[in-house]
Amino acid sequence: KKVNKLYCFPGNAGTAKIAKNVDIDLDNFKKIKNFILKEKIDLIVVGPEKPLVNGITDYLEKFKIKVFGPNKLASQLEGSKIFTKKICKNFNIPTAKFGIFTNERKAQNFLDKSNFPIVIKADNLASGKGVYICENKKTSIEAIKEIFGGKFGNAKNILIEEFLKGEEMSFF
């Protein structure tokens, strides 16, 4: 099948060269659905994590709209570092040793038993910024305070894990 028209929500200067940018709030699933139906769009490819984590694939599929992207449950692998760690543990997938903490005090107490460096992560979408590699207790306490203080939104939990030396890789 041939592609006749390409839309990007919301798009940017780069996508404007190959597609029509559409200014739609990615949190407004109803408005997105209405635009898709009005324009008779055949396939939606969802890129950003937030709408995926919020369930846009599930929502659009209810209206028989073809969507390429994981459903809400599968998107939690990206949306919650703790969810992913629990999946790894439950299915014996090798991963760094970790602890889950719901408040600053418990997280800071854990530092007394930690070997540094350690990794501290906010358990929510943080645009790739919610990860700290901490060399000592002082920088760890600062990271914990920043995360629970709202730097990355309303993080109710944090993940503290052992630091694994090596090259970082992402696969898409």
Where do the PLM segments sit?
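Solvent-exposed alpha-helices and their adjacent loops that cap or buttress functional pockets
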Residues: K1, G14-A16, F68, N90-N92, ...
